[in-house]
């Protein structure tokens, strides 16, 4: 009886379900997608999702506490737009524009933490508010115009050579993603911060 329960709990665990869904989708598109398994398709897929996965590492800590952050996409967009405006219209050097991008997104994180921890606003409501706030600020600052960062070949394009450069056709961003995954996994499993987050979410 215990053995049957352990097998059932194994197959019903979230990790197994998530992995099974991923394998199913991969097999489905491999069978019915004409060019899905080509090298160009795989590289393009990795290049388009690695930064989203990096954002998901941070979201894992938030969800493990029993909370949620609805603003993460709009905050990333707002930071990128303000950084683009800083470089294109305010004529700041690219390193300053990147620092401004980080500071803007960090400020929204601090605001979310203040609203949730100090003002006792539910995470769903607080982050929904900052989501629209970030979206509005991004639209106002950029005037709903596309902001372009320097191309790889320009002197200011050094950061793209760091993050977008390929290693024998393999995107460097994916390598950074794997490194961040190892760091985040270690923090989540073996550090006080990770265990504290899980303890809060389990209570």
Predicted regions and their residues:
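Transmembrane alpha-helical segments of polytopic membrane transport and secretion proteins
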Residues: 1-20, 28, 37
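Alpha-helical transmembrane segments within multi-pass membrane transporters and channels
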Residues: 91-131
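Hydrophobic alpha-helical transmembrane segments
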Residues: 15-20, 45, 53, 74-78, ...
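Interfacial loop-to-helix junctions that mark the boundaries of transmembrane helices
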Residues: 7-14, 39-47, 90-96, 161-175
